Regions:
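Extended beta-strand/beta-hairpin segments
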Residues: 1-50, 61-117
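Alpha-helical metal-binding/catalytic segments enriched in His/Glu/Asp
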Residues: 55-56
Length: 117
């Protein structure tokens, strides 16, 4: 690995309960469940989708701030669609951005910045 490479490290451990994993990222610890397990915590797919949508929020807010675009708030909704016959794969992922404080042209440009990252 080169010095210009950033590595994000996450570790997951068995919990002793089928369908539940204990996870660690930096100094943060969290539980992820499988729908076939306890299904009390976020599921793996929900955590995956949250990573994508929260990336949209933080990247767009930072880019708007850095370029002087007056975003006053935003909401990103993401829906992952899977077949009941094969729920291990997403068939489609839809992402909707509601960005406040800007006109449609500015919002579309901000979303395009996210898409290109």
């Amino acid at each position: 690995m080169t010095e210009d490479t950033k590595v994000d490290l996450v570790r997951s451990y068995s919990s002793g309960m089928p369908g539940r994993a204990l996870n660690q990222a930096r100094m943060h610890h969290f539980v992820l469940d499988s729908p076939s397990g306890p299904n009390e915590a976020l599921t793996n797919s929900e955590a995956f989708l949250a990573g994508i949508s929260s990336c949209g929020v933080t990247l767009i807010e930072r880019h708007a701030r850095d370029t002087g675009v007056p975003v006053t708030g935003m909401e990103v909704t993401i829906a992952g669609r899977r077949s009941r016959a094969d729920p291990t794969r997403f068939q489609r992922i839809d992402v909707r951005f509601d960005i406040r404080g800007v006109d449609r042209r500015q919002a579309e440009a901000l979303v395009e910045t996210w898409r290109n990252r």
